[in-house]
């Protein structure tokens, strides 16, 4: 949870779903997405500016292409795609920047990050470099980034497209996907699955809290992780909950 304030609930998410997603870990969400048949949902290689801050929001996408000087001269200056993307952000939006994993230039810095914050954005995710890293990390907006680089984006990139499917950290992100971020990184949830994934993830963490209580009390992991029939019976008796669907793999 952020050090100050609370993330705004993105439009279209129920209070119950948003509360669950702000509580559960990306690791747990990953387990439930895998059970749903989705294995490629974690944005690899991005780190949080502040691991204590949670991210929750809907994706707005920005795509950078490799630098070609004549193209940059035509479309890269002034109110380019990067600046238009920032100016179009609404409360609950997460700006997802596809930089092809290129770390040889900055992709956003403190001025545009501040503007995103003031427009109510829920966060920024870039698989490229971050400029003005210390200043950005002090802002009141979650930021996940691939690395730090002092150079402007024009050293390696042309800002090209807004609100198209992109690849960020090797993961496909569609505009409108739900993003959750924590100390491990950022995970992508398809909107049509988000309510069920949130519910099952919350139940999985309840189960794991029960398992942890047994391990702390001296129990072996054998029979408890994963839970066998006897352990499941104990959990049902203690919680009056059907655990079959959400149980830890």
Regions found by a protein language model. Give the residues of each.
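Beta-strand-loop-alpha-helix segment that lines the small-molecule cofactor/substrate pocket
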Residues: 182
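Channel- or pocket-lining gating/hinge segments that regulate access to a cavity or pore
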Residues: 185-187
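Feature captures the catalytic cores and cofactor-binding loops of soluble hydro-lyases/lyases
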Residues: 2-175, 189-249
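C-terminal binding/interaction regions
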Residues: 179
């Amino acid at each position: 949870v952020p050090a100050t304030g609370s993330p705004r609930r993105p439009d279209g998410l129920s209070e119950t779903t948003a509360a669950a997603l702000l509580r559960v870990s990306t690791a747990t969400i990953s387990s439930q997405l895998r059970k749903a048949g989705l294995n490629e949902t974690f944005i690899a290689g991005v780190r949080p500016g502040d691991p204590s801050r949670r991210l929750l929001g809907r994706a707005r996408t920005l795509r950078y292409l490799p630098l070609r000087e004549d193209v940059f001269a035509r479309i890269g200056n002034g109110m380019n795609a990067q600046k238009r993307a920032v100016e179009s952000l609404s409360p609950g939006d997460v700006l997802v920047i596809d930089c092809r994993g290129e770390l040889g230039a900055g992709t956003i810095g403190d001025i545009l990050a501040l503007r995103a914050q003031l427009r109510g954005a829920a966060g920024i995710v870039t698989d490229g470099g971050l400029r003005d890293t210390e200043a950005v990390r002090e802002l009141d907006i979650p930021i996940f980034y691939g690395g730090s680089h002092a150079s402007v984006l024009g050293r390696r990139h042309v800002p090209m497209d807004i609100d198209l499917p992109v690849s960020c950290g090797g993961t496909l992100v569609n505009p409108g996907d739900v993003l959750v971020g924590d100390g491990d990184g950022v995970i992508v949830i398809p909107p049509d699955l988000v309510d069920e994934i949130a519910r099952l993830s919350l139940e999985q963490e309840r189960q794991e809290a029960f398992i942890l209580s047994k391990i702390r009390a001296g129990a072996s992991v054998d029979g408890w992780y994963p839970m066998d029939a006897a352990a499941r019976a104990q959990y049902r008796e203690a919680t009056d909950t059907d655990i079959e669907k959400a149980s830890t793999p």
